Structures are given as structure tokens and as C-alpha cells.
Amino acid sequence: MGKAPLASASIMKSLLLVAFAAMFTQASAGEAPWTPLFNGKDLTGWTPKIRGCKAGENFQNTFRVVNGVLKVDYSDYPQWDNRFGHLFFTKKYGHYRLRVEYRFVGEQLKGGPSWAFRNSGVMIHSEAPETMEIQQDFPSSLEVQILGGTGQGERTTGNLCTPGTHVEMDGKLDTRHCISSKSKTFHGDQWVNLEVEVRDNRLIRHLINGEEVMSYSKPQLGGDAHAEALAKVAGDKMLAEGYICLQSESHPVEFRKIELQELAP
């Protein structure tokens, strides 16, 4: 008789574990699957827009696929000549998680700006490549800025830059162009995992190797004439969706996984 309570407790514990496992399975089953945006073979589904060129023109094969890796490569460039570029995925998104694996390799192209050393970005809530002006450097968007360490000192990644946009931080409008995250520094050519969680214009979170390094809300167009023109056409300055694109800023960078999970509104 004295052992009966222990047996009952053991049974209850087992039942609770089964219940929690069932709940987790149901939650997982209710989530959308992760979908690759990059097929590992070619640039199907992606459109380049490089400064000085029309949308769709991949100047000097800047964006290329080699051995299953999407490379931003400048080996065919005669010189930099301010050829800032972006590679746009074909579909707009507003509620999603995005996962990207990236690393910096090689040397910066001669003539590239000093601030662009081991510097690139993943743009979200972006305008379309077709609405960019021919000589426009960056699309109006939110740039999840990715930086590589210089070999000494600290240099965070997963930062935020805001070409043609503003956001709210801690409930207040923040008009700074670039805002540092609280990430670690990643030197050398190691692969880094970037994840971005986007809940239309309510909340956006940046995660590096699984750790949240930044969050903000209420992204909106503003800060230059082009962005204000986009807002006028849209009838609203608030950004609830947009395109995803990868950046080229004069330093070679590689992406080997780009996948997205759509979220319920």
C-alpha cells in the first residue's frame, strides 16, 4: 500500500509527457514547411538589379552559382565603379521566417568603399527591382546588414540599415541610418546562420546562430524623395510586406542556404 502513491505519480508523469508531446506534434504539424528559395543549381526565381543596369541584367555575372553555392563574385569586373547590386526573389512576403547561411571570402574589389569591407546585406520589405531608378544604389527597404570581423576588435552582424525607411525602436521613431545589433563578432571565412522573423509591420526580429540580436517594429517609407514617391503611389508609408533581396557591395560573399517558412497573419 505504501508504494501505491509512487506508482500513481509515475503514471501521471508519463501521461503528462505524452500530452506535452502530442501538443508539440500538433503545433509542429500546424506550421508551414520550410521552402528553399535557392535551388542550389541556378538563379531561377531571382532577378538582379545592379546600379547602371536595367532590372534583369546580371552585370559581369555578379551573381552566380558554383558547386551549389550562390556567390557574389567580382572576378569579371574591370573596376568597381559604384556597381551596387541586389538580387531579388520573385515573390513578396509579409509574414515569414527567413533563414540564410552566409560567409565572406577573398579580398574586396579594388576601388570599393572602405566601409564595404566584409559588408553585405539581406534586404526585406523591399521595393520591386522594376521600381528602382537606373542609378539608384539601394532599394527602399530594411537591410539586415551582415558584417564579417576584420581580424581584430568587435564588429557586430545582423545589424539594421534603413535605405529610404525608418523604424520604431522601443516604441519611438528611430531615424538613424544604421543601428548595431548585440551579436558576437565572426572573423575569417566561417559560415554564419542568419534568421529573420517578420510579422508584417508589427514586429521584426534578427537572430544570429539562434540568438536574438535585435528587434523593432513599424517599418515605414521615408527619408528621401524616392521613398516618399513610393509611399504616395502606395497611399501609405507603412511597410507590411515587400521583396527579399541579397546585396553586392564590392566584397565577395557566399550564400549556401536560403529558405523561408510562411507564418499565419
Segments predicted by a language model, with ranges:
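Low-complexity intrinsically disordered segments
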Residues: 8-9, 22, 32
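Carbohydrate-interacting regions of secretory-pathway proteins
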Residues: 29-265
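Positively charged n-region of N-terminal signal peptides that target proteins for export
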Residues: 2-3, 9-15
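Sec-dependent N-terminal signal peptides
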Residues: 15-23
